[in-house]
Amino acid sequence: MAEKRKYSRKYCKYTEAKIDFIDYKDTSLLKYCLSERFKIMPRRLTGTSKKYQEMVEKAIKRARHAAIIPYIVDRKDVVTNPFEGI
């Protein structure tokens, strides 16, 4: 039988920084929860708490609606650092 993987405990970046509100215009806060294709990453990968994950999701959806963050990225346009040009 294969051995179980041991993962290190992930901590919420937003609770450590004591952030009350996540603004949709602040892309530097949102980049921790986005993949290289601008998909919202799940809590188990980012380590954010439930409260902040809901706030981040809402802020990302608002930023997409305001055209600050793109909805989708083609395979050709995938970059290593998605926030270089912003």
From Swiss-Prot:
The entry's keywords: Ribonucleoprotein, Ribosomal protein, RNA-binding, rRNA-binding
Gene Ontology biological process terms in this record: translation
Signal peptide segment: none
One Gene Ontology cellular component annotation held by this UniProt entry: cytosolic small ribosomal subunit
SUPFAM superfamilies tied to this protein: Ribosomal protein S18 (SSF46911)
Oligomeric form and interacting partners: Part of the 30S ribosomal subunit. Forms a tight heterodimer with protein bS6.
Task performed by this protein: Binds as a heterodimer with protein bS6 to the central domain of the 16S rRNA, where it helps stabilize the platform of the 30S subunit.
Family from the record: Belongs to the bacterial ribosomal protein bS18 family.
Protein name in the entry: Small ribosomal subunit protein bS18
Species name: Campylobacter curvus (strain 525.92)
